[in-house]
C-alpha cells in the first residue's frame, strides 16, 4: 500500500516501509496501526497514528493486505534428527496452537541444505509473512549467513550459535544432561557411559557438556569413577545397529548409560535386551526428551522431560512481541528448563562395605 502526503502529487508518496523507518518501528507495526488491526500495544498504535497525522500521511486508494501468516521454517541439513517425529510433533503442536490463539495463521516451509539456499532465502524475504520461526535443530554456524539479513522479524528455535545472536528459544540441555548424570552418580554407579549421537548438533554438544560437568564434579567425591563414550547413529535403525556392533566386542559394559535422546535410548534398550542384559539389573538407562514411547517401554524409562509444547509457545510469543513493538535494541535467549522423570530403568547400587 502507498501512503501520500496530503496535497502532494502521487509521485511524492511514501511507502509503509519508509514510514516505519521514520518512526523506528517495523513495517508490520505501521500496517497494523494504520489499518486498525489488533496485534500491537496501544502505546505503539498511538505513536504511529500521531506521527502519521503530523506528517500528513493518509491512505491511498489502494489497500494493503496485512499479513496474517507466521512462517515456520524447518531447516533440513540431513533430516536424521527430524526423524524423531514424536518430539517435533509436540513442538509444532505448541506453535500451531499459539499462532491460532493469537489470531494468526501458520505456514510451514522447508529449506534444504542441498538446494539453492540463496534463492530460497530471496523467496522468503519477499513473501508476505509477518515473521519467521526458524527451526534450526540441524543448522550449524556456517548456515547462519543466509538468514542474517532476512529483513523480517525472526526467532530461532531449538539451537543457538556462537557467530549469530538473534532472538532464540532453546532447551537447557546442559542442565538436563547434568541432572541425568547426577542421578546415576547418586545411585552409586562408578562406571558410566554416554551414548552419544554420531550426528553433531548443538543440542547434543550441550548435553555432552552437561554430562562431563557432572562427571568432573564427581571426581572430587570419588576418585575411582570412570566414564566412556559410545557413538551411535541418531535414527532408530542406525542406533540399534551401532549398539549391536559395540556389544559384540565389549568386555566391560558400564553399569549405567546416559543417552542423547529417547530415540537412541529405546533402540539401544532393545539391543541390550537381545544381548541378554537386564535393565536395570545389569545396566541402568536414562534418556532425554520424554517422548510418549519412553513410558510404554518395558521397563518404563527414566528420562529428562522437555516441555516440548512450551518451546513452540514461547517462540511464537517472542516473535509476536517483536512484530508488535518493532523496535529492538537487543536480542534475548530463552532457555526452557527440564525435569528428571524417575521411572524404572535406574538401579540403586549397593554401597561398598568397610574394608
State where each predicted segment sits.
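Non-catalytic positions within long, well-ordered alpha-helices that form the structural scaffold/packing
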Residues: 21, 125, 185-188
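N-terminal helix-turn-helix DNA-binding module of bacterial transcription factors
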Residues: 1-66, 353
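Periplasmic-binding protein-like
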Residues: 129-135, 193-196, 229, 250-261, ...
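Hinge/beta->alpha junction and helix N-cap segments in small-molecule ligand-binding domains
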Residues: 77-90, 108-115, 169-179, 195-244, ...
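Alpha-helical recognition/docking segments in bacterial nutrient-uptake
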Residues: 2-7, 11, 68-182, 246-252, ...
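Short helix-capping segments at alpha-helix termini
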Residues: 101-102, 216-224, 249-252, 274-279
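Flexible loop/turn connectors
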Residues: 244-355
Amino acid at each position: 500500500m502507498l501512503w501520500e502526503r496530503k496535497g502532494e502529487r502521487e509521485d511524492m508518496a511514501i511507502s509503509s516501509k519508509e514510514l516505519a523507518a521514520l518512526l523506528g518501528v517495523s513495517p508490520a507495526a505501521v500496517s497494523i496501526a494504520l489499518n486498525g488491526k489488533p496485534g500491537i500495544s496501544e502505546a505503539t498504535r498511538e505513536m504511529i497514528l500521531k506521527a502519521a497525522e503530523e506528517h500528513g500521511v493518509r491512505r491511498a486508494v489502494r489497500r494493503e493486505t496485512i499479513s496474517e501468516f507466521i512462517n515456520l521454517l524447518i531447516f533440513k541439513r540431513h533430516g536424521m534428527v527430524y526423524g524423531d517425529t514424536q518430539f517435533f510433533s509436540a513442538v509444532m503442536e505448541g506453535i500451531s496452537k499459539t499462532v491460532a490463539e493469537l489470531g494468526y495463521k501458520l505456514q510451514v516451509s522447508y529449506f534444504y541444505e542441498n538446494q539453492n539456499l540463496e534463492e530460497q532465502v530471496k523467496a522468503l524475504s519477499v513473501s508476505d509473512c509477518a515473521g519467521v520461526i526458524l527451526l534450526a535443530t540441524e543448522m550449524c554456524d556456517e548456515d547462519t549467513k543466509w538468514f542474517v539479513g532476512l529483513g523480517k522479524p525472526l526467532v530461532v528455535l531449538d539451537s543457538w550459535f556462537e557467530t549469530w545472536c538473534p532472538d532464540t528459544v532453546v532447551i537447557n540441555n546442559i542442565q538436563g544432561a547434568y541432572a541425568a548424570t547426577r542421578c546415576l552418580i547418586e545411585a552409586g554407579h562408578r562406571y558410566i557411559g554416554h551414548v552419544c549421537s554420531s550426528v553433531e548438533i548443538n543440542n547434543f554438544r550441550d548435553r555432552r557438556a552437561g554430562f562431563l560437568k557432572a562427571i568432573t564434579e564427581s571426581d572430587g567425591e570419588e576418585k575411582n569413577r570412570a566414564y566412556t563414550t559410545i557413538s551411535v547413529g541418531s535414527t532408530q535403525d542406525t542406533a540399534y545397529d551401532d549398539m549391536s556392533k559395540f556389544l559384540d566386542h565389549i568386555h566391560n559394559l558400564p553399569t549405567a548409560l546416559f543417552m542423547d535422546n529417547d530415540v537412541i535410548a529405546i533402540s539401544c534398550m532393545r539391543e541390550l535386551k537381545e544381548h541378554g542384559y537386564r535393565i536395570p539389573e545389569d545396566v541402568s538407562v536414562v534418556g532425554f526428551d520424554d517422548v510418549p514411547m519412553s513410558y510404554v517401554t518395558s521397563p518404563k524409562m527414566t528420562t529428562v522431560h522437555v516441555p516440548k509444547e512450551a518451546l513452540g509457545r514461547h517462540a511464537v510469543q517472542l516473535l509476536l512481541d517483536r512484530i508488535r513493538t518493532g523496535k529492538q535494541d537487543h536480542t534475548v535467549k530463552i532457555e526452557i528448563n527440564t525435569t528428571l522423570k524417575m521411572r524404572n530403568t535406574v538401579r540403586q547400587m549397593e554401597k561398598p562395605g568397610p574394608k
